[in-house]
């Protein structure tokens, strides 16, 4: 709920009374300070609604690639994010009662407890799934595994261990247990439940020089089959580098899973552009689909593919767009009402940084005959933007996109009615001064009130977390929030 909006609309006198009382409290410092120190006291009448539901995010608490970070089910939106020690934290919001629960810690990440390295690794953010029995699953904690896990048969290792936690009771986020049933050699988890209840967990099987794989469960995630490679890493013979990939997998129509991806040229140390060695250099956009009923993979024209797909096969059969000298950062993929794929890809000019330079969100789509598009969602914009999109008929596309305007972080809707050739800004959902936003992909089965998670990045700790919808952020009582926030260990 939005308290200010509600009081203004339904009870102007109530709103004025609340405002007057707040001013009085500001003058009566001793009395009000005493009341605020007793958050559980019924005497506390100065509680207020805030736009964030938690304030303990760390590092980059959210990303589009680890998805879904939230799910709507039975009138409740369940959300997840990276909290203290890079552990997975889970909260929920009941849309009927207006009540929040949590956040609760769902597991213990090895990434936040490693020796050396940078302060936050950020690769083990939680991914969520709810099985057919109502148990909530969280996949988290890996950046490819480490040498202590043994030899990675499908790549190399780095840090952490990919883990799988499940709620102890259906639809209950308060207690969790780890299930030791997925490989520790994983990162960038993406979880998909098919209509028949089968679960597919997609991820990269290790650090940069590793295959992309999936593991399948037919018993609500209690056991998983061995990893199956679908994108192949291999050493190049023409340059000092290894073929690598970044993928985004989502549910398509019926029994199909759709996958978009970009290519990472993983340079050896001292090689590459200007001898920069290993950078995040990535290029091009690809697409293919997986029929889970037949087990067959195919390109957009229905041509069958043999797994694992190599760079040569990808270039010949699955290419959606060449990006030339632009460096890329992959986004999401969705189907329109005609079953044609659309892809979000972030691309920008290499400006010599380790990451190349800022990348802007662009839209690519298959029109039934060829891949078209590639223009920016935000015209003339040169800084960093990220967004996820909804598409109905091929011409109507809506992006919920974050960008910066001066020093402000902005999250707003951008609308196209011509298949992505032109986008126009519609309305702003969230705006914060002197900040930047990290966002999730769209919440699975989202309702208009709660569509995306947002992290307000002012520093790298104590980050405020928002659940936003068409009308802005879902609010929470500040007293309730302070009472609910856990202490990290």
Curated annotation (Swiss-Prot):
Supply the alphabetized keyword list.
Answer: Cell membrane, Lipoprotein, Lyase, Membrane, Metal-binding, Palmitate, Signal, Zinc
**What positions constitute the catalytic site?**
123 (proton donor), 188 (proton acceptor)
The keyword Nuclease is assigned to this record: no
Annotated binding of Zn(2+), by residue:
208, 264, 266, 278
What general EC class does the enzyme of this chain belong to?
A: lyase
Family named by the database record? Belongs to the polysaccharide lyase 25 family.
Question: Know the name of this protein?
Answer: Ulvan Lyase-PL25
* Chain's role: Ulvan lyase involved in ulvan degradation. Ulvan is the main polysaccharide component of the Ulvales (green seaweed) cell wall. It is composed of disaccharide building blocks comprising 3-sulfated rhamnose (Rha3S) linked to D-glucuronic acid (GlcA), L-iduronic acid (IduA), or D-xylose (Xyl). Ulvan lyase catalyzes the endolytic cleavage of the glycosidic bond between Rha3S and the uronic acids GlcA or IduA, producing oligosaccharides that have unsaturated 4-deoxy-L-threo-hex-4-enopyranosiduronic acid (deltaUA) at the non-reducing end.
Topology with respect to the bilayer: Lipid-anchor
Secretion signal, residue range per the UniProt entry:
1-31
Q: Where is the lipid attached (S-diacylglycerol cysteine)?
A: 32
The record lists the lineage as:
Bacteria, Pseudomonadati, Pseudomonadota, Gammaproteobacteria, Alteromonadales
């Amino acid at each position: 709920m939005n308290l200010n909006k509600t009081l203004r609309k339904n009870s102007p006198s109530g709103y004025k009374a609340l405002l007057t009382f707040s001013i009085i409290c500001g003058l009566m410092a001793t009395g009000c300070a005493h009341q605020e120190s007793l958050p559980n006291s019924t005497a506390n009448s100065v509680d207020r609604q805030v736009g964030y539901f938690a304030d303990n995010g760390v590092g980059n608490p959210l990303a589009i690639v680890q998805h879904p970070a939230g799910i709507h089910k039975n009138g409740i939106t369940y959300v997840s994010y990276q909290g203290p020690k890079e552990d997975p934290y889970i909260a929920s919001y009941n849309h009927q009662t207006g009540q929040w629960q949590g956040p609760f810690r769902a597991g213990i990440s090895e990434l936040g407890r490693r020796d050396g390295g940078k302060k936050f690794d950020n690769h083990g953010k939680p991914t969520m799934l709810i099985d057919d029995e109502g148990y909530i699953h969280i996949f988290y904690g890996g950046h490819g595994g480490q040498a202590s896990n043994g030899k990675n048969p499908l790549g190399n290792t780095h840090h952490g261990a990919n883990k799988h936690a499940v709620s102890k009771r259906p639809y209950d986020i308060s207690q969790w247990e780890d299930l030791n049933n997925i490989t520790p050699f994983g990162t960038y988890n993406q979880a998909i439940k098919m209509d028949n209840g089968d679960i597919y967990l997609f991820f990269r099987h290790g650090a940069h020089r590793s295959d992309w794989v999936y593991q399948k469960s037919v018993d609500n995630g209690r056991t998983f089959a061995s990893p199956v490679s679908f994108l192949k890493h291999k050493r190049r013979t023409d340059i000092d580098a290894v073929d690598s990939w970044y993928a985004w997998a989502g549910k398509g129509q019926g029994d199909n899973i759709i996958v978009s991806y970009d290519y990472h040229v993983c340079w050896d140390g001292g090689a590459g552009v200007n001898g920069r060695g290993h950078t995040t250099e990535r290029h091009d956009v690809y697409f293919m689909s997986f029929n889970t009923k037949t087990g067959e993979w195919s390109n957009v024209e229905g041509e069958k593919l043999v797994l694992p797909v190599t760079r040569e096969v990808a270039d010949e059969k699955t290419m959606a767009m060449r990006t030339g000298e632009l460096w890329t950062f992959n986004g999401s993929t969705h189907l329109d009402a005609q079953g044609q794929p659309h892809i979000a890809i972030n691309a920008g000019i290499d400006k010599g940084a380790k990451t190349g330079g800022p990348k802007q969100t662009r839209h690519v789509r298959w029109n039934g005959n060829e891949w078209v598009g590639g223009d920016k969602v935000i015209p003339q914009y040169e800084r960093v933007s990220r967004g996820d999109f909804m598409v109905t008929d091929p011409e109507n596309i809506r992006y919920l996109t974050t960008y910066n305007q001066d020093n402000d972080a902005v999250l707003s809707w951008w609308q196209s009615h011509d298949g992505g050739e032109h986008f126009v800004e519609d309305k702003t959902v969230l705006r914060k001064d002197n900040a930047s936003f990290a966002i999730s992909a769209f919440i699975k089965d989202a309702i208009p009130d709660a569509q995306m998670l947002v992290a307000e990045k002012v520093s790298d700790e104590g980050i405020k977390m928002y659940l936003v919808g068409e009308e802005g952020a879902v609010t929470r009582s500040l007293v309730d929030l302070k009472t609910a926030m856990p202490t990290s260990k």
